[in-house]
């Protein structure tokens, strides 16, 4: 399942032309995400859920993905010590952007495009095993 989701993520990101800059690039990513099949969206959501479940299992207080300093890794802060999780693989900025936008609803993507950022409160609900991201 994870391998399939990562493959889907890489295929979608590969469709993003190098010539698209800044917010135009984010909007193009949003268009690609909107065209995903329900199966692809489900696979990407489960991939993100796996990262969040791991976060919970290792008692991490936060997760960091996609910053320029990330080196393409997903980072967890565990008891105040922030480290890359190299065993989760390497991702490009576009791959992180596709993954993050794939869990956002359309209104959140519109908020991102209009405000050029997405300050969010993200909660992992153990009861429903779902990620909730809401603009703040």
Please provide the spans of the model-predicted regions.
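N-terminal "pre-motor" subdomain/linker immediately upstream of P-loop NTPase catalytic cores
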Residues: 3, 17-136
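Intrinsic-disorder signal
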Residues: 2-11
């Amino acid at each position: 399942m994870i391998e399939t989701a990562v493959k889907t993520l890489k295929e979608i990101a590969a469709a993003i032309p190098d010539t698209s800059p800044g917010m135009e690039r984010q909007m193009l990513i949003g268009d690609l995400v909107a065209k995903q099949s329900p199966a692809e969206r489900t696979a990407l959501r489960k991939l993100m859920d796996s990262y969040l479940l791991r976060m919970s299992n290792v008692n991490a207080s936060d997760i960091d993905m996609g910053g320029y300093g990330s080196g393409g890794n997903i980072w967890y802060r565990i008891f105040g010590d922030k480290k890359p999780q190299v065993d989760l693989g390497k991702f490009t900025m576009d791959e992180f952007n596709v993954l993050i936008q794939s869990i956002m609803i359309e209104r959140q993507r519109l908020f991102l495009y209009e405000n050029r950022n997405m300050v969010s409160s993200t909660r992992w609900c153990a009861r429903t095993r779902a990620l909730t991201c809401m603009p703040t």
